[in-house]
Amino acid sequence: MISPLLFDQNISFRIIKEISSHFPGSKQVREVGLEGKLDREVWNYAKSNGFTLVSFDSDFADLSLLFGFPPKVIWLRLGNSSTNRITAVLTQKKEEIQIFLKNEVEGILKVESAL
C-alpha cells in the first residue's frame, strides 16, 4: 500500500479536499493536532503513522538525510504557490510520486514544475 501524505503547516489544510481522491488518507498537520509543533514532532508522527511528509521546508529533507526514512519526504520547490497550483502539480506528478513511494532506496523526492 502507498502511504498517505501529511502536508506541513505551510500548505493550506484546504488542499485535502482537492487531493484526497488522488492520494487517499492524506491529512494536513492541523487535522492531526500538530499545527505549530516542532518539525521533529511532525516527523515522529509521520513515521509512527505511516505518512509521507509534503513540505516547502528544507528541514524535513535535512531530517531525512540525518535519520533516513521512513518517513519519506516530498520537498516542494515551487516558490510561492496557491493551493490550486500545488494540487495541479501533485496531480500532474502523481505517477512519479507513486513510483517514489514504492521505491525502497530513495527517501526524498524534490518536486519542481514549470506550471
Regions found by a protein language model. Give the residues of each.
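Short, hinge-like loop/turn segments at secondary-structure boundaries
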Residues: N44-A46, P70-I74
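Intrinsically disordered, low-complexity and often Lys/Arg-enriched segments
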Residues: M1-S3, A114-L115
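Short secondary-structure transition/capping segments
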Residues: D39-E41, L65-F69
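N-terminal first-folded block
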Residues: P4-N49
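Small/polar loops that bind or transfer phosphate-bearing groups
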Residues: F7-D8, S55-F56, L78
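C-terminal structural segments of small proteins and small subunits
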Residues: V73-A114
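Acidic, metal-binding active-site segment of PIN/NYN-like and related structure-specific nucleases
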Residues: G50-S64
